[in-house]
């Protein structure tokens, strides 16, 4: 049976989803699972949780723990699949730094993990560590597949695909939830009759086609989206709204609380949490996979010192990721006992791609995914060295991406503004030149629309110094 190594196993809830999925999959349930982390306590907590799930599933898997860099190569040795979920530098201090230093220069961010100065420095902290993984993998498991879940997805996956020989695919759940989110929030409902075509780049892939029983849904989507952004779409009672957004499935308490808060906000003010994406769709013609808080900082249109009223108009949550980190830490404290000390803990297979990919490669039964891969002629009006997100087929032969051809030109043009930053950041990680970091941040759409070149250079110098313990030297 296969060996699955999970890098960053201290990401306990995510490890439960991915590895719990594997243990619930007949083709993978007898796997040898290697948990690797540099944090002893989090590693132990994840192991306790997964061992309980395994016992309640008949103890079919073998679970092993590997702590610290000295054990990394052994964790990887003989692996068939490697799942990457690391965060270099963590929330405190690195995420805090990614927000606070730019804020001194008047540059505000929402998430800062994929693009912008925050995304660039997150990549520069992470790429050297992932290349260390790659060097170990080239020695002890050269034929393994690396399934990367860590952001910034395009930068990290692109670096692995161009700077190592390791077979890598980047995975992001925003593809799976794109059409259901859009149709349910517009009260159109989502079901298995809906067919979609999605392609572009990670967090900015485009819903190119959306049909139900062959009928193009876009005309009605755009009609309702305009009403929704004007606060005029009738969304029903709270009970009706909750059932629509959840597809009738039970929700964790904290999710339901946030949905209710957003429902009340819309009823009171006409504002909601997806206004940026719907505005971009109405302007560019197509809906984008990732959330509005992300896309607010991928473009130069919404977070602007000169137009502070846009923050309220489009309901943009500045500094959202630090708040989210604090909330997740608090929620983990409340769930710790439930997940690590519950002898009856079980798991139901989630929608995360990882176990479905492994199952397809083990059994030969193909599965369609949205994967991040190198653009080798797949999207013909995007750069060939870009990391693109396209439909892929997974089976015993690995990952076979789909050729899309040209995107609508306005969609490709917006993608290219993000790709410029991604490629320049990977180049900075390769050259270790400070000037290439400056160039990556200078090319960022949001940063360049707000700051002068001199301020960008000064900000980068401060960031480099603050992150010195997590980044290699730059000349």
Task: Locate the predicted segments by residue.
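N-terminal Rossmann-like dinucleotide-binding module
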Residues: 2-29
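Glycine-rich phosphate-binding loop and adjoining beta1-alpha1-beta2 segment
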Residues: 24-58
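Short acidic low-complexity segments
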Residues: 63-76
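An anion/phosphate-binding loop that grips the pyrophosphate of nucleotide cofactors and donors
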Residues: 79
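Conserved NAD(P)H cofactor-binding loop of Rossmann-fold oxidoreductase domains
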Residues: 86-89
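Rossmann-fold NAD(P)-binding glycine/threonine-rich loop
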Residues: 92-162
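Internal, well-ordered domain-core segments that constitute the primary functional module
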Residues: 133-221
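Long, compositionally biased stretches enriched for glycine and/or charged residues
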Residues: 190-475
């Amino acid at each position: 049976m296969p060996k699955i190594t999970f890098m960053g196993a201290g990401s306990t809830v995510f490890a439960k989803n991915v590895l719990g999925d594997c243990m619930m999959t007949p083709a993978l349930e007898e796997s040898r699972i290697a948990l690797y982390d540099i944090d002893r306590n989090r590693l132990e907590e994840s192991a306790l949780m997964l061992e309980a799930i395994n016992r309640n599933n008949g103890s079919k898997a073998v679970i092993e723990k590997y702590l610290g860099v000295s054990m990394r190569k052994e964790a990887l040795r003989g692996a068939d699949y490697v799942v990457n979920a690391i965060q270099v530098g963590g929330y405190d201090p690195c995420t805090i730094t990614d927000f606070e230093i730019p804020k001194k220069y008047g540059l505000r961010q929402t998430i800062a993990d994929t693009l912008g100065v925050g995304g660039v420095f997150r990549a520069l902290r992470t790429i050297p560590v992932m290349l260390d993984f790659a060097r170990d993998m080239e020695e002890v498991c050269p034929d393994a597949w690396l399934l990367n879940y860590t952001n910034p997805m395009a930068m990290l996956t692109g670096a692995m695909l161009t700077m190592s020989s390791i077979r890598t695919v980047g995975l992001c759940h925003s593809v799976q939830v794109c059409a259901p989110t859009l149709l349910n929030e517009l009260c159109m409902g989502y079901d298995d009759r809906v067919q979609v075509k999605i392609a572009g780049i990670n967090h900015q892939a485009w819903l190119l086609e959306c049909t139900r029983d062959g009928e193009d849904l876009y005309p009605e989507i755009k009609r309702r989206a305009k009403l929704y952004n004007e606060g005029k779409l009738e969304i029903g009672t709270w009970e009706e709204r909750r059932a629509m957004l959840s597809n009738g499935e039970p929700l964790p308490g904290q999710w339901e609380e946030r949905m209710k808060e957003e429902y009340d906000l819309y009823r009171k003010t006409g504002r909601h949490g997806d206004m940026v994406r719907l505005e971009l769709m109405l302007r560019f013609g197509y809906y984008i996979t990732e959330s509005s808080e992300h896309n607010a900082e991928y473009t130069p249109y919404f977070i602007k010192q000169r137009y502070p009223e846009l923050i309220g108009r489009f309901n943009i949550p500045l500094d959202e990721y630090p708040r989210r980190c604090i909330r997740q830490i608090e929620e983990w404290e409340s769930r710790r006992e439930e997940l690590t000390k519950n002898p009856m803990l079980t798991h139901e297979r989630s929608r995360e791609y990882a176990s479905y990919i492994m199952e397809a490669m083990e059994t030969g039964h193909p599965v369609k995914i949205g994967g991040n891969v190198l653009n080798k002629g797949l999207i013909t009006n995007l750069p060939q060295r870009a990391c693109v997100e396209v439909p892929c087929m997974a089976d015993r032969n690995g990952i076979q991406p789909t050729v899309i051809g040209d995107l609508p030109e306005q969609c490709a043009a917006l993608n290219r503004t993000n790709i410029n930053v991604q490629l320049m950041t990977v180049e900075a990680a390769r050259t270790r030149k400070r000037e290439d970091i400056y160039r990556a941040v200078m090319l960022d759409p949001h940063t360049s629309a707000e700051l002068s070149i001199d301020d960008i250079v000064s900000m980068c110098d401060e960031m480099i110094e603050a992150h010195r313990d997590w980044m290699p030297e730059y000349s």
